[in-house]
Curated annotation (Swiss-Prot):
Biased composition (Polar residues): 616-626
Taxonomic source organism: Bovine papillomavirus type 5
Main location: host cell
Chain positions with Phosphoserine modification: 90, 106
Protein name in the entry: Replication protein E1
InterPro entries assigned: Helicase_SF3_DNA-vir (IPR014015), P-loop_NTPase (IPR027417), PPV_DNA_helicase_E1_C (IPR001177), PPV_DNA_helicase_E1_N (IPR014000), PPV_E1_DBD (IPR046832), PPV_E1_DBD_sf (IPR046935), Rep_E1_papillomaV (IPR016393), Znf_lg_T-Ag_D1_dom_sf (IPR037102)
Annotated binding of ATP, by residue: 452-459
Biological-process GO terms, alphabetical: DNA replication
GO MF, any single term: DNA helicase activity
Amino acid sequence: MADKSGRLLGGCSFVLDEADCSDLEIDSDDESDKENVPNGQDMCNSFDAEFIDNAPLAQGNTLALFQSQVAQAGKQKVNYLKRKLHLESSELGTVGRAVLQPVNHSTPAAKRRLFECSSSENEVSYAASPAAANTQVFRNQNSGSVGGSSGFGSQASVSQSQQNSNLHLQILKSKNSAACKLAVFKFVYAASFCDLTRPFKNDKTTNYQWVAAVFGVSEELFEASKQLLGRSCTYLHATCRAHEKGSVALLLLSFHVAKSRETVTNLLKNLLNLRAEHMMLQPPKLRGVTSAMFWYKMTLSPNTYTWGQLPRWIEQQILITENSSEVLKFDFSHMVQWALDNEMMDESSIAFHYAQMADHDSNARAWLGLSNQAKIVKDVCTMVHHYQRAIMRSMTMSAYVHKMCERVNVTGSWLVIMQFLKFHGIEPIRFVNALRPWLQGVPKKNCLAFIGPPDTGKSLFTNSLMSFLKGKVLNFANSASHFWLAPLTEAKVALIDDATHACLKYCDTYLRNFFDGYSVCIDRKHKNAVQIKAPPMLLTSNIDIQAEEKYSYLKSRVTCFYFNDKCPLNEDGKPLFQITDPDWKSFFERLWQRLELSDQEEEEEGDENGSRGTFICSTRNSNDFT
C-alpha cells in the first residue's frame, strides 16, 4: 500500500490485493483513534496481529519418517550387494518389491531376473557350480533335476533316464549350447575339452584319431557300443561318468582309415541313439604333455575300457628314456646328411619328407618344434647344393656314369635303344662311336644334334638320356636373361630341346665355345661369375644345320643324327618305343669297354681321399667314439 505521497508503507507487502476487510471486526473502543490514523496503516496493523502465530507447535511423527528412510536406504544397499555378488533371492518386504524389479537386457529372447520369487511358476537361476563360473548356464528348478528346488521342496532321487533327458533339455534350451557342454564336461572330468583337442573348422576334414564327448548317453547303449567300435578302431578308450545332471561319456577313437567329423558323428548317432547336438567331436592334441598324461592316467582307472595298443604319440610323451634330454635338441648336420643321402635338392621336398619322419626320428620332431623351420630348410637346401656341386666336380665322367647306374635298381634291356636307332636308319655302331668322344668332352665333338620332322621321337630319345644322367635342360625362352645358362654350373650334361632359327643364331653367335667343349665363363645371379669346362650337350631341332649355309660355323662343331620316320604308337596312343632308365643302365653296362670308360675298381684304389665313398657331413655323438 502507498500513502497519498506515493511512498510504500512498511510491513504491508504481504497483504493480498483482494483481502476482505470488515468494519464489524473493529472494536468500538478504537473508533475514536481510527479517525486520527490513516486508513492504510490501520489495515496493515490489523493483518500483522492476525497472521503471526507465536503459539507452541507439536513435534509430529518425524521419528517414523526417519526410520522409513533408514530402512529404505538399507534395502538399497542389500540389493546392490546381491546384484554384485549374484546371490540368490530371499523373501522381500513390501518396500523392497517396488525397487527390485526384473532387469530387461537388450536381447528380448533371453531375460534374466536379479532375484527369484518363490511364488512364480517357472523360476530360472544360474548354475552355482565352479565349472560354470565363467559360463552362464540356465536350469529349470521345477524340472525335477537333482539339486533343483521348487516351492514344494527338492526331490531326493531321480532315475538315470530322467537325468539324461534333463541334461538334453538343458543343452537345447541354453543360449550357447557349446559353452554349456564345455562347462558340464569340465565339471565332470576336471579338465577342459579344449586342452585335450585341437579344433577342426571343416566337418569334411579327415583324420585317423578323434575325441568324442557324449552327453546324456544311456548306460546300456554305451556298454554295447564298446564292442562295435572296437571292430573299426586300432585303439579305443571309453569311459563314462554319472553326474547329477546326467551321464557324460568320453571316447578316444583311433580308426583304421581316416574319417571326417560328419562320418564319426553319424556312427555315434546310430550306436548311442543320440542327436548331433549332444556330442562334441575334435581330433586329439598330439603334441602336448598335459593331454598325453590325461589319457594315460585315465587308462589306469578301473572304470575305463581300453582296447588295442596305446597310440605312439602318447607313449613318446609319457615314457622317460635315457635319451629323453636329447629329444628337444635339434642337430642341423643330421638334417643335411639326410637330405644329401636321399638326394633332396628342393626345399619343398625336404620340408615335406622330413616332417613325415617325426614319428620315428627325434631330430625331425625337434625340428617341427622350432619356429624358424623355413629358414632351416632353406639353409639345408643351400648346403646340399654346395656338397652336390663339389662332389660332382670331383668325379670323372666314368665315375659319374657308374654312380647313375648304381642308382637304378631295376634291370632293363639295351636292345630297346638299338631297335629305336635301327628304326630311324642309324647304325648303332655309328652312334656308339659318336657317344664315346661326347662323354670324354673332346673338342669339336662335344655336341650331338638330332634333326628331323616333328613326331619322330627326338625329344623322347634325348630326354630319356637326360633323365638317366640327371642332366639340365635349357630353355631358349629365358635367353633374355643373363643367367639362363647358370644351370650348366651344376650339370654334367645338358640339353637344348627344339632349337629354332633364333636359337641356332644365338648359338652360332655366342655359344661356339660351348659346342667346342672348352672352358667358358658363366654369370650367376647374386654371385660371382664362375669358369667351368663346358659339359657335353645334346641338341634337337627341325632345321638341318648341315644344309643351312648361314650356320657354317656350327657344322664342324655338331655331330648330326637324322630321325626321318614318325615314331609308331600302340593302341593306347603311347609310343611303341619306351626308353627308361633301366634300359640306359643296361646299355652303358653292355658297352662299357667300347665307350672306353675307366674301370671303377682302379679309380677307387688310386683315390687316396676316398671321394668315391659315402660323404659324411653330420657331427658324431659321444657314443660313436670307442
